[in-house]
Amino acid sequence: MADFVSTSPFGPVLTAMVTPFNADGGVDYGVAEKLADHLITHGSDGLVVCGTTGESPTLSWEEEHELFRVVKQTVGDRGSVIAGTGSNCTREAMEATQIAAKLGVDGSLQVVPYYNKPPQEGLLAHFQAIANCAPELPLMLYNIPGRTGQSLAPETVYRLAEVENIVAIKEATGSLEQASLIRAHTPDDFAIYAGDDVLTLPLLAVGGAGVVSVASHLVGDRLQAMVQHFAQGATAQALEIHLQLIPLFKILFCATNPIPVKTALGLQGWPVGSFRPPLCALSPGHTEQLRDVLRDLALLP
């Protein structure tokens, strides 16, 4: 675990891990184990498994449960494993969270219910029910309205932060104002994570705990160094790393996540495979732009 004193039990740099597929389109659990080990030994304090970056919408529950098991077995006590067990069906989310807890994960990522767009009182009841069904498992809320069609209002977060095992939120609204409001109205030990790599350093400045990162697949050590510099008051050094990595942060979202980062891993030689439909390959033009950025940052073999 890093030296940074985080307000979260998960650590400051969490990687939203991709899901490797083999040539037949099945989950490649062997590569998942190797990738998890690599990430933990290269700057990541923990891994978020089966989140957006892990292509969770096209994984079966059985595949997700096996990923939780093998990744936690690989990581052991070297880092945290947070299982993506959210759903737009409260009952399904509760069942998946209970199974993940039995598999020994360290926490659960709970996305705002998508498509059915429940009102704030419905969101409150949804997350309270999930927390109550697995009271020993720390939960991280996940607010990403660009994908779900509904945002978790700051006032709802204030109320949810009072629940003992709701310990964090991944804020992917892109709004520092929203993050600041949450920081001002929740307990000090309620952790706020950036959901966008480019906002990691700004969020730390308004009381954030860290990042759930995509770029850490490639630059985990540099992100960890940035966080440590900030924590030690070396803000100029933290800013230098942040500015150096801006081109990478941008190119990794030139297309729908996780298409660019999985392509980048492939360019590095990682056999992570392709994507499950309806996701598709990165365009040739964007692939060349990605290759250029990786080369500039000395990230290619």
UniProtKB/Swiss-Prot annotation:
Give an example GO molecular function.
4-hydroxy-tetrahydrodipicolinate synthase activity
Cellular component terms per the entry's GO annotation: cytosol
Native organism: Synechocystis sp. (strain ATCC 27184 / PCC 6803 / Kazusa)
EC number, as in UniProt? 4.3.3.7
Q: What is this protein called?
A: 4-hydroxy-tetrahydrodipicolinate synthase
**Location within or outside the cell:** Cytoplasm
**Where is pyruvate bound in this sequence?**
T53, V212
Q: What is the lineage of its organism?
A: Bacteria, Bacillati, Cyanobacteriota, Cyanophyceae, Synechococcales
Query: Which CDD domains does this chain map to?
Result: DHDPS
Q: Identify the residue position(s) of the site Part of a proton relay during catalysis.
A: T52, Y115
Keywords from the named record: Amino-acid biosynthesis, Cytoplasm, Diaminopimelate biosynthesis, Lyase, Lysine biosynthesis, Schiff base
Pathway assignment? Amino-acid biosynthesis; L-lysine biosynthesis via DAP pathway; (S)-tetrahydrodipicolinate from L-aspartate: step 3/4
Q: Offer one example of a GO biological process linked to this entry.
A: lysine biosynthetic process via diaminopimelate
Residue positions of the active site: Y142, K170
Q: Which family does it belong to?
A: Belongs to the DapA family.
Role summary: Catalyzes the condensation of (S)-aspartate-beta-semialdehyde [(S)-ASA] and pyruvate to 4-hydroxy-tetrahydrodipicolinate (HTPA).
Q: Which reaction does it catalyse?
A: L-aspartate 4-semialdehyde + pyruvate = (2S,4S)-4-hydroxy-2,3,4,5-tetrahydrodipicolinate + H2O + H(+)
First-listed, main subcellular location of the protein, grouped into a coarse class? cytoplasm
Q: Name one Pfam family in it.
A: DHDPS
Instruction: Please give the start and end residues of each transmembrane region.
Output: none
